[in-house]
């Protein structure tokens, strides 16, 4: 087996390396596969990991994301793969090379685990063809740059093997720990894996039709307990991540469950063809389920093979149809994505379909026989599918489509020839599969990766240059502050996008950030201050910001390639310079008032309101400038400007002040995904592109002589959507007054770690203190050793009150439920070890006390139904409102009672009542549960509304009480005249 496992690793890696050689991808050239999200996100996040081991950062909190955020959700989503530890020993500029090696290793290991699974299922058979197809499936190739997803793909065959072991009455060790690891390494794909394991378990349970019912029930119990143990083992990362996601983009809406058809069923079949993906389809295309034409042909032959029982064919056909339906029907697709529509990279559960596709094809291969009529049917089916694909113009890479069809018929000819001659066909099919998968892999890289034209050397030179100047700054000033930069990593590609997470590469406290778990409330605040926000991204403006927003957010330094007016240049290295903000304030300072209105879309008005409230000085920094607007070749309808050629939009401003003039045009919608590029001119001189995806914030128009007129002109095509336009002067003298007032009482903070700050402040009287750190229940503030309450301000930041005197402050962050998660994982680990060692003895004890154990198991499952439904509803509804609180609790009760009745009737009390007796029994069951529901409501009201216990904790306490009461009522009052099936004690 060792030789086969080695080949299953070497072969896919060698194929990819050969393609890299031809396409001049690193290590054979300067191109890179690390594009799109891996270039903008993962490179930065993984590099940041090093600072948690060797720097002052830790795994609890980070100030390198927006204004600061809980690091656990980001850690759990992006960084838990053990392969990432390899990167901490390399310099930042080499991170892309290291990650490329890691991707190759992961794809190779996909082949190894699949080969291991197949060898256990088909000992001594030649299965390399199928493990190769798994390793090089389109999912792995097109999503290889999502390297944190690949760990679960590696583990999935082992998880399935673990389920097989459970059916074979072996120890559940493999299943428990591989399932736990898949969730730990990436909880998002881990949840998909859990659903995949459930699908396989049901499939296997139906397929194994010869087993006695008691044995099937034993398997069900063993699988259920093992699944729960695997899930609870991951709670140390899953629990704090889940609660940390409450302010992220992952917000469920009932409107998401609208029944929509995403793609036609035939598209699913088309996507099984080699090179069945066109340009850009990784963003919003069909499922990535191609794994070679050999697999596709063997799959068809499976359903025509007379050696395979008809029942097996029907079960497998239903399975594939159901899996295909998850690509077609929106609510089913959403089920695999946490009930949220993916922003891009659709059908992320496609690897489950591919796995079943391959194991069915492997079964077909093991039962191959020569049947002339069947082989003709296969040829006709392939021909018809090919014609339909061509006629309906599905998105294929046209240059390889002909090769795909030709290859299909070559495969058929070879299969017919070798089967007819009764020769060994495995080596020939493997060679064809290698050629086929090479075409598919090359197509994937060419059409979806290479067009970005990223360069390893450009990235390396950029990182070295920027890292050097930031290190120079840190040697000069190692205090706690924020800094930002105004240039992108590669100016000719996606302006202001590639460098959005540079604060994590270079380990500085920045405000620009993009990830899938960021706090949306912080992003909204940044938008209110005039920064660009787009879905889960927040940007420091390419052309800078206002001095006031820099002051309020503690931005002390700006790294820029251009001269930065009003700031002092302190470092110059090559074409880069660092400028110091003369109006810098620390992370915390004294304010007069915390009741502030920032609901306007006008960032200048919002900034005025904030500083006036903070200082008590009723003078505006920003003064409105009137303007006139005109347009050419444009039709205006409400906020929309449309043109059939080149539209021109002109603003004219007569200068009435010598101060800096700013402008801002608010985007048209809350999520702001609408954008159209327009060329911006100032007095007919091209300045920049505006209304773009990444450049749509406050911009300075400079200082101008009083009495002159400046013209701001936009040239655009098609249409622009503009909600409001603002022109304001920045009065530096008034800004100075506000700054002097705020700078009088600042906290002198010192960073101990990223989750612990220490500071000092001296106050002459009791005062309110403002922290420009996002409000989070995880923060604990000790002042002179005593705990002080923190309050939200500006919807998302933090404030607190202090008495007069000299104070020492300690600010410590502990992610919500992280301690509870660790305790649950440790207890579960102990139970898992005991369960694995004693599982046979436990089963014997179970058969003796079957009713009690079944009730406890069903009780746990019922509790999960209640908890999950309640947690979802409590986040959909405002549970602070008593009506919605009761509605959420009522619906969760109805769902759990329905589940409990049928499961208790069948598995616990084994009631066989029918007709009127069954109705009476159901009535008594519902009545008893209604009684415990009333008890549930009363205790919940007391705990949540009167005692003020956290509603989640309260729900857990109440469920334990209700669990005990329900058993007593069911045993003594409901299932009193039941007839039971006798259990085969010998089983």
Residue ranges and their predicted role:
Residues 22-121, 126-157, 181-185, 280-282, ...:
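Active-site lumenal/periplasmic loops and adjacent helix-entry segments of GT-C-fold
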Residues 170, 189, 314-325, 331-334, ...:
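Contiguous transmembrane helix-bundle modules in multi-pass membrane proteins
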Residues 73, 433-457, 472-550, 584-585, ...:
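Extracytoplasmic/lumenal acceptor-recognition loop(s) of multi-pass membrane glycoenzymes
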Residues 16-17, 103-117, 125-208, 220-247, ...:
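Membrane-embedded helix bundles of polyisoprenyl
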Residues 1-25, 218, 222, 417-429, ...:
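Start-transfer (signal-anchor) and selected internal transmembrane alpha helices
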Residues 86-87, 112, 508-642, 650-666, ...:
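A cross-kingdom signal targeting lumenal/periplasmic-facing segments of multi-pass membrane
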Residues 40-49, 82, 219-221, 230-306, ...:
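Periplasmic/ER-lumenal interhelical loops and adjacent helix-loop junctions
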Residues 2, 45, 621-843:
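Active-site-proximal, structured, solvent-exposed surfaces of multi-pass membrane proteins
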